[in-house]
């Protein structure tokens, strides 16, 4: 009888194996018809050239990382440094960055083989009453030490795509951490400008109180001289508590501004008690560039982070597609086993096992397609978020450019109004003192001057705030890394394929 060899078995079984493999491939889960629909928008397609053409903001570069130092207030510099060192929101951003980086490490580990070692000892004694004297009543044991090896071969790049997605997400988290610091700096500067405005209102109210007290004194003198009546005195007296109320309201605004700054630097309310009056902040000290929309892409941290998340979502699609293809897993086991621990080092005690395994998804109830469709939707969401960030950024820049330009002109006009109102008040007071003018003229001129001074203080505060907001809209001093710059430069309006 002719023995059946392995080669003859393989020769006769190969057609059947190939046919089965072909059938399995034809029946396996398919990603056909699934793809994302989002398309990245190009900044040039949003047409902001005419709006920003007349900005004339200067020839300086984008805001420096410490742009607020241009305002020349050491106390502001110290407050921002304190906030950057201790604010809880920054600790949260740093924690999210550590989470993202740990996910990079986990994804990297999934690409590498696993090796472990195990050892143990088992013993058994069977009862003599059941097995007799020859077998029962004796103790038998064995010890073993084994090395376990496993490796999932990344045939289709799915694991690498998952790792690359984690890397891109970590880049986004790093940009978010920078953005949190830049936003905190801008928020502290805006709150500081608000405190400066409160002090300006305090000055205006104090000046109004002094004018009211002076007018009351003069009116009493005129009544004593028989020129004015009690009516004029009562009118003058009513102006004093009104001015005192405005002074008290300004002081309340100062106190609230100090408390707000204390919170922004991550401290308790008592920290605000040590905040002195701010220096006069000059909005023109913040030198800003002539805006180039294309350069804005790499300077806005929210746009850069959104771009990284688009890239991460695209890599997740690649990883999801790889799950539709066969997977190969290698496992191996090698070690020693012996009935006596002392015999473990003998060559006769060694054993080994290797078992490659190929897995192919055929029917999973639509799980893989649902997973891929979900990743496609994630990509579309990331693209939509990026596009919205881009639109918002251009509108923020355009709005603040317009505000800076308009407020500068308004402040100049309002300064002229204050000068005119001050002169009119002085003239009305002189006429009243000389007895040729009425107290109503003084009241009217005084009210006009007060309102003009309050409006000027408000416009000057808005000037500083608009300059700060424009600095923030232009990136707030964000300094992109080389990877960030390359990612911004690679922008295209084609969707992930």
Model-derived regions, located:
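Terminal intrinsically disordered/low-complexity segments used for targeting and assembly
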Residues: 2-6, 14-85, 143, 167, ...
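Short flexible linkers and secondary-structure junctions
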Residues: 29-187, 328-332, 362-372
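Small/polar, glycine/serine/threonine/aspartate-rich low-complexity segments that form flexible
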Residues: 62-71, 120-148, 162, 271-289, ...
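Membrane-embedded beta-strand positions in outer-membrane beta-barrel channels/transporters
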Residues: 80, 144-148, 192, 237, ...
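Sec/SRP-type N-terminal targeting helices
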Residues: 91-92, 108, 153-181, 231, ...
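A short glycine-centered flexible hinge/capping loop motif at secondary-structure junctions
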Residues: 223-227, 432-436, 473-477
């Amino acid at each position: 009888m002719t023995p059946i060899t392995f080669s003859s078995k393989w020769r006769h079984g190969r057609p059947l194996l190939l046919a089965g493999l072909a059938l399995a491939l034809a029946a396996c889960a398919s990603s056909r018809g699934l793809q994302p629909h989002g398309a990245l928008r190009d900044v040039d397609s949003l047409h902001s050239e005419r709006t920003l053409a007349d900005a004339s903001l200067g020839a300086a570069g984008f805001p420096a990382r410490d742009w607020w130092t241009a305002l020349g207030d050491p106390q502001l510099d110290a407050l921002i440094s304190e906030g950057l060192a201790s604010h809880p929101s920054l600790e949260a951003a740093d924690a999210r960055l550590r989470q993202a980086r740990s996910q990079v490490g986990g994804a990297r580990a999934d690409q590498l083989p696993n090796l472990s070692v195990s050892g143990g000892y088992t013993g058994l004694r069977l009862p003599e009453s059941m097995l007799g004297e020859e077998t029962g009543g004796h103790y038998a044991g064995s010890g073993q030490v084994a090395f376990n090896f496993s490796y999932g071969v990344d045939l289709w790049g799915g694991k690498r795509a998952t790792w690359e997605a984690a890397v891109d997400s970590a880049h986004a988290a790093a940009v978010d951490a920078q953005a949190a610091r830049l936003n905190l700096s801008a928020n502290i500067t805006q709150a500081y400008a608000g405190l400066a405005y409160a002090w300006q209102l305090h000055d205006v109210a104090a000046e109004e109180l002094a004018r009211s007290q002076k007018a009351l004194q003069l009116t009493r003198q005129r009544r004593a001289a028989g020129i004015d009546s009690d009516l004029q005195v009562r009118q003058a007296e009513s102006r004093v508590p009104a001015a005192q109320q405005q002074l008290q309201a300004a002081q309340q605004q100062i106190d609230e501004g100090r408390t707000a700054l204390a919170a922004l630097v991550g401290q308790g309310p008592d920290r605000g008690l040590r905040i002195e009056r701010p220096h006069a902040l000059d909005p023109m000290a913040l030198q800003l560039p002539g805006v180039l929309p294309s350069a804005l892409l790499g300077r806005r941290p929210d746009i850069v982070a959104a771009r990284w998340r688009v890239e991460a979502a695209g890599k997740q699609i690649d990883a999801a597609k790889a799950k539709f293809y066969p997977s190969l897993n290698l496992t191996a086991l090698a070690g020693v086993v012996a009935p006596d621990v002392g015999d473990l080092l003998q060559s006769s005690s060694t054993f080994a096992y290797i078992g490659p395994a190929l897995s192919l998804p055929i029917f999973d109830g639509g799980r893989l397609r649902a997973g891929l469709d979900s990743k496609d939707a994630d990509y579309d969401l990331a693209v939509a978020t990026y596009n919205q960030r881009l639109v918002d950024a251009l509108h923020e820049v355009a709005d603040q450019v317009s505000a800076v330009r308009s407020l500068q002109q308004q402040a100049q006009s309002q300064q002229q109004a204050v000068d005119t109102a001050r002169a009119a008040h002085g003239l009305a007071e002189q006429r009243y003192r000389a007895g040729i003018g009425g107290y109503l003229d003084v009241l009217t001129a005084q009210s006009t001057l007060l309102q003009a001074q309050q409006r000027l203080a408000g416009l000057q505060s808005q000037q500083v705030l608009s300059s700060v907001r424009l600095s923030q809209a232009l990136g707030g001093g964000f300094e992109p890394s080389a990877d960030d710059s390359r990612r911004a430069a690679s922008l295209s309006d084609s969707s992930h394929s």
